[in-house]
Amino acid sequence: MCAVIGAILLEPTKQDFAMLRRVFLESKIRGMHATGMSFLPKWSDKIEIIKEPIPAHEFIFKHLHDDNLKDMVAEDGNLYMIGHCRYSTSDLEYNQPMFYNEKSIVHNGVITQELPENWKDIYGYDCITKNDSELVLHSNDPLREFSHMSMGVVELHQDRRIRFYRNGKRPLYLSSISNGCIITSTADIAIRSEIPGIPVEVLMNHYITFDNELAMMIEKVDVENAKDLQHYELC
């Protein structure tokens, strides 16, 4: 169990920065072994990544004060960020976010139980880590390709887009605000973070993308026999 975070904030204010810190702080309940983030800074058109084996409250104190966050605002005046709070079940070298080919991701879930040395033969990807989230990073269509496994994912793209999605085995929520959107793993994280508005559950097996003008694109993925276990009820 981990927490994933996503944010696009147009011309963010100090109040927005405080809200973002609350999101990281409230997300740590789902993982305290490591915290990380990716963002598009004003000094570069490349994605920057910071991740450390520390809980979110220490990460916030070290990296998310207002002066640092101002520098994380992109050249267009907007903030594009994804984050991760990790509950570790293996080596801390597997911390997130991850980056490949102008895309960074944070992932909550399990993609494979196969040994890493077999991934190339099974999935066709040359992975440089033993973190199975890297398979999602390489895939262009993970909802179809790994439909049998579990995922709640937020992607940050260098062209100032955020894409997010889940299958029926992991939760994910979207909160729309006046100047942007916030993605959290659960509704209660959004509520405790005092994000304005009501968190809405992300539709299962849909790719949802926001661009730098908050234009939204939704792509439905047809997956045979898909079930949303977030709403599973015992008979």
Where in the sequence are the language-model features?
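Conserved short alpha-helical segments that host acidic/polar catalytic motifs at enzyme active sites
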Residues: 1-235
